[in-house]
A protein has these predicted regions:
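Conserved beta-hairpin
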Residues: 84-130
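N-terminal membrane-targeting/pre-transmembrane regions
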Residues: 1-68, 174-180, 191
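Hydrophobic alpha-helical transmembrane segments
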Residues: 66-81
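Residues that cap or initiate secondary-structure elements
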Residues: 114, 124, 132, 164, ...
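Extended hydrophobic-aromatic, low-complexity segments
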Residues: 117-119, 135-136, 167-168
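A membrane-cytosol interface segment of integral membrane proteins
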Residues: 144-203
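Short, surface-exposed loop/helix-turn segments at secondary-structure junctions
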Residues: 136-145
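Hydrophobic alpha-helical transmembrane segments of multipass integral membrane proteins
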Residues: 48-58, 77-88
Length: 203
């Protein structure tokens, strides 16, 4: 639990640094980045705004009702700013870990918690298809299909030539024949993927 919390904390601050100073992680030549934040952007925006308002509201409340407790104002301010930066870092963590398509393969990600590297030779086809999943979990498996959803949505289907094993956050998933995931611009991702696919199989 502590190790997981620490990894989250480090990842958020690194992502915040990369986003603030516009220093994205390098990618291979010919690769493109594709975001997947759009469905949850409004929610993240609300949390960030609320966190900022809370800082001011708590500071004013302490100043008004407990004017002699200067130390409490300082503590509350530090915690409030940390919480605000944490929320911004959460958004940055998604923005700085986009999906990638490039010469070496397709890379499907979900912040720093999931990173699937799929060589093109393992893929039969990549196609657009919008789906809404009833289960609200981000990572789902149903039979031989794995879904990486954002706000219960997926937009791209990846069909493998043969069953593969995917390294998921809760452990490896063997015998997977299809991966579904969300991306903000599925048509562009699929079009770029098609330029790398070898003898794509139509389905």
């Amino acid at each position: 639990m502590i190790k997981k919390a620490l990894s989250w904390e480090i990842a958020l601050w690194v992502s915040l640094y990369r986003l603030t100073f516009r220093r994205p992680a390098p990618i291979e030549e010919g690769a493109r980045r594709f975001g997947y934040v759009r469905p949850i952007a409004p929610v993240l925006g609300v949390f960030i705004v609320v966190s900022a308002i809370d800082i001011v509201a708590v500071d004013l409340a302490i100043h008004h009702f407990l004017p002699s407790w200067g130390w409490l104002r300082t503590v509350a301010l530090v915690l409030g700013v940390w919480g605000l930066l944490w929320m911004i870092g959460l958004a940055a963590n998604i923005l700085t870990h986009p999906h990638l398509t490039g010469p070496s393969g397709l890379r499907v990600r979900n912040s720093h918690t999931l990173d699937l590297v799929l060589p093109w030779e393992t893929i039969a086809t990549v196609r657009t298809r919008s789906r809404y999943l009833i289960d609200g979990a981000t990572v789902q498996r149903e039979g031989d299909v794995v879904s990486i959803a954002i706000s219960s949505l997926t937009a791209v289907d990846v069909v493998f030539r043969e069953p593969v094993t995917l390294a998921l956050p809760k452990g490896p998933a063997a015998g997977v024949t299809e991966l579904r995931f969300h991306v903000d611009d599925p048509e562009a991702l699929v079009a770029h993927a098609q330029t790398f696919l070898q003898d794509p199989v139509t389905a």
